[in-house]
């Protein structure tokens, strides 16, 4: 029987590397001393990593791995079951469609349709989902899950336009005009709301009344069509913010554009909807609908041919002479007058405006020439609605040392146009109020100003043909020399020849002239031939200035109106009503209208 335990082999000469048992050592008592002893004698450093272990975000790594596996599985299923569209090859290249690797084989005819378990499973599932969505109760009231549809669709506006045409029976673009800018303003707006609460839509009929003069609302399920006319013009941004705050919706649930105001089908569409029981209407029908639908308004706008005489009469009655004033105000008048509307539709607006301005100037020029100076002054007083006091004129003349009686005597001869007394010169140092005093006088009498700077032009005196009083400011010595050499007849008050633009030289008497200067020509012997043709007043004192920088003496149209009304008898001015025994003259009429006050 063999001995149990370790068998000893007799290996002679090899006993040095065979260890039969552990040797006991008394020099090291504990395990720690043994570890310290071994570390001290070791030649390998940092063999053991004693740092704190960082676990990391293992859950995120696991989720990323799971997502990657799911994506790979879905991609494999899509490649397996989804068929590529047949037209994809033709869309890529028509020539590529002709290239075929496998030969063409005719498909076998089948008596019965395939069960679709293998090929048509995806198509059947899609068809089933569509049928379920169509059978839902929400689609019957026009609402549906329109929010989800709008979010999923690539073109939200196209989806909303299609739904609008399906629900309301008309294309949205046929009744609206597109504003490219959201900041363009309009009074009338067409607003379409998608997927809003019915209660909120009903309450909006009351809330919008404080903002609008006309409201037409038609609610179709969870959608609504608004035609509103605001009290003031609003932009698309303002309208969208207002509707979003009232209905608690988002901007993508809304279509907002102004209606076609000149479209008869658009007017008839909203006029028809206003009579339906489903529609709620507040306010009076807008004018753009009434003019195109109601018989009375259509009869009032039947005369669509433009008449220049009516335009001239309107400009004459409203005292519009400049071309810019006529063009702007007559365009605004198109909402009230058919002839102005026909003017806007005309392609010759510039010609009409130019002709109208020319005719009005001719009529006004003849009336001015036909009036005496007294009639003209009282006409200016009647047209001035401002009230004032004539005392600042008297106080200012007294401040400058001018006797009021002497001034009235000279002014009386000046207004009558007596020869040799047809020109008043006010001279003195600078800042004495000469120009302020004369400009206010010329403004009230609607005079014209000529400037010596334009002397090189042949027509620089032409403005004096259209006024009752002329004015030249700040005449220098060179200017006086020119007047002495060329314009003695103008100061005499006798007829002279004036070169006018686009016409033959005109023979007429120049109006009384008012001139300011810093030179006292009475002291200039070289201008002695002008001494008998002018009447001078000296303003030696500077104009007093208040603390705010304004002059102490101010002269307005009301001041001169009060001056002529107060001192009319002293100036020998006669009231036209007294000459006609209180009977007013007949107003001018250049068109065959029945009522002269219709404008």
UniProtKB/Swiss-Prot annotation:
GO biological process: one example: DNA replication
GO cellular component: host cell nucleus
Main location: host cell
Segments of this protein annotated with the region Disordered: 124-144, 575-599
Compartments it resides in: Host nucleus
Residue numbers covered by motif Nuclear localization signal: 78-80
EC number: 5.6.2.4
Catalysed reactions listed for this entry: Couples ATP hydrolysis with the unwinding of duplex DNA by translocating in the 3'-5' direction; ATP + H2O = ADP + phosphate + H(+)
Enzyme class: isomerase
InterPro entries for the chain: Helicase_SF3_DNA-vir (IPR014015), P-loop_NTPase (IPR027417), PPV_DNA_helicase_E1_C (IPR001177), PPV_DNA_helicase_E1_N (IPR014000), PPV_E1_DBD (IPR046832), PPV_E1_DBD_sf (IPR046935), Rep_E1_papillomaV (IPR016393), Znf_lg_T-Ag_D1_dom_sf (IPR037102)
Record key words, sorted: ATP-binding, DNA replication, DNA-binding, Early protein, Helicase, Host nucleus, Hydrolase, Isomerase, Isopeptide bond, Nucleotide-binding, Phosphoprotein, Ubl conjugation
Binding site for ATP: 428-435
SUPFAM superfamilies for this protein: Origin of replication-binding domain, RBD-like, P-loop containing nucleoside triphosphate hydrolases
Cross-link annotation Glycyl lysine isopeptide (Lys-Gly) (interchain with G-Cter in SUMO), location: 509
Motif (Nuclear export signal): 92-101
Keyword Membrane recorded: no
UniProt-annotated stretches for the region DNA-binding region: 139-303
PTM field: Phosphorylated. Sumoylated.
Residue ranges with Polar residues bias: 124-140, 582-599
Stretches assigned to the SF3 helicase domain: 402-552
HAMAP family referenced in this protein's UniProt entry, alphabetically: PPV_E1
Oligomer and partners: Can form hexamers. Interacts with E2 protein; this interaction increases E1 DNA binding specificity. Interacts with host DNA polymerase subunit POLA2. Interacts with host single stranded DNA-binding protein RPA1. Interacts with host TOP1; this interaction stimulates the enzymatic activity of TOP1.
Protein name listed in UniProt: Replication protein E1
Organism of this sequence: Human papillomavirus 4
Gene: E1
